[in-house]
């Protein structure tokens, strides 16, 4: 993930996590017992992936640092989108967590179901389309920064072909891909943007192979929307702007 998106994700998690700060001391019995408010994050990849999940974990650590002993944070990593999400959520609730951050789009169905089942727990989705009384969605206009990165990519390409590695064809990713392509065309009219779908949020090997394929097809500048830094690392190793 590029540095702009990494910083944006970290900032957004910190902003969204203020919900935990507001809840400290307001949960039933918390003020009397002095018990720390428990907050949990669920990651689709490893917490130190060098990209999306790591940005969220930096947000978690910032919350822990800001609130100190008032909050106890935890995380579950490498949770695949599917039935396992519900199991992880239920486990976190049994452990006493009162706010849960789901950081992958595919966690949404399980998060929404859990929100209905546990009205006393708060749920925060990083990107999503479902809002409930105790479930919110947080994100920002990432396409603005991605449009600017597209302008930079268009200005840097000499071959007139820019490559872009993307995960899933969901609205958010399509919006970001369009923004990148429009940015390329803004600074380099007539330039082409070639994309490869990895159909995975975090798959370093797939992302590297996609970058190799785009490079072989003539793309001399590469961008990415996946979670790991693999595409960027390949680009850097081969002297391509990224």
Q: Language-model features: where?
A:
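A residue-level marker of the well-folded mature domains of exported/periplasmic proteins
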Residues: 2-9, 23-24, 29-242
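Hydrophobic alpha-helical membrane-insertion segments, chiefly the h-region
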Residues: 15-25
């Amino acid at each position: 993930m590029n540095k702009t998106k990494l910083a944006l994700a970290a900032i957004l998690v910190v902003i969204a996590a203020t919900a935990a700060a507001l809840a400290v001391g307001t949960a039933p019995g918390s003020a009397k017992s002095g018990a720390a408010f428990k907050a949990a994050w669920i990651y689709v990849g490893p917490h130190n992936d060098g990209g999306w999940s790591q940005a969220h974990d930096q947000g978690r650590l910032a919350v822990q640092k800001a609130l100190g002993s008032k909050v106890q944070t935890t995380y579950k990593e490498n949770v695949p989108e599917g039935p396992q999400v519900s199991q992880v959520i239920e486990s976190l609730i049994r452990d006493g967590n009162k706010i849960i951050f789901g950081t992958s789009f595919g966690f949404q169905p399980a998060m929404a179901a859990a929100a209905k089942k546990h009205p006393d727990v708060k749920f925060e989705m990083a990107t999503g389309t479902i809002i409930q009384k105790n479930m919110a969605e947080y994100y920002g206009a990432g396409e603005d920064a991605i449009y600017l990165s597209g302008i930079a990519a268009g200005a840097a390409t000499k071959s007139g072909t820019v490559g872009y590695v993307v995960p899933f064809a969901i609205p958010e990713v399509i919006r970001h891909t369009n923004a990148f392509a429009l940015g390329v065309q803004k600074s380099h009219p007539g330039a082409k943007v070639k994309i490869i779908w990895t159909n995975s949020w975090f798959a370093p090997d797939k992302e590297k192979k996609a970058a190799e394929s785009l490079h072989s097809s003539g793309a001399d500048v590469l961008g990415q929307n996946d979670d790991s830094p693999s595409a960027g690392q390949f680009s850097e190793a081969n002297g391509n702007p990224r």
